[in-house]
Design a protein with these regions (language model features):
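Non-heme di-metal
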Residues: 1-128
Length: 128
């Protein structure tokens, strides 16, 4: 069992089905990329509003990543995590070059995708 900084124990059974392990691996990669989106924004944006938004969301996504780190053992994580991190950073930095509107539109698109992805996973869990 792993304990997070918030002292909430986290453990998963050893007999999780393969599809659920794959979903968790995907979610871990996604959270890794999400952290980098906000780091990319912070590296490029000069807008104080955008930077405040990015700092707040970076804290949230960092908590999510810590949870996923606790749930998914290193040997079960995607071998392409480095690529998802790079893609995340570029996904944040590139729109930040074009200003706040581009940043917020990009985040809206990413979050819309993520909401759909998690909805599919919840449906799969409900039907398992």
């Amino acid at each position: 069992m792993t304990t997070l900084a918030s002292d909430h124990p986290v453990s998963l059974p050893d007999d999780l089905p393969g599809w659920l392990r794959r979903d968790l691996r995907s979610d871990h990669a996604g959270e890794s990329g999400a952290v980098e989106i906000y780091r990319g924004i912070l590296a490029v944006s000069g807008s104080q509003d955008v930077r405040a938004f990015a700092r707040e969301h970076l804290r949230t996504e960092s908590r999510h990543l810590r949870l996923m780190d606790a749930l998914v053992p290193p040997e079960q994580r995607s071998r392409l995590t480095w690529l998802w991190r790079l893609a995340g950073w570029v996904t944040g930095a590139l729109p930040a070059l074009f200003g706040p509107r581009a940043v917020f539109r990009t985040i809206e698109a990413v979050e819309t995708f993520v909401d759909g992805h998690y909805a599919e996973q919840l449906t799969a869990l409900a039907n398992a």
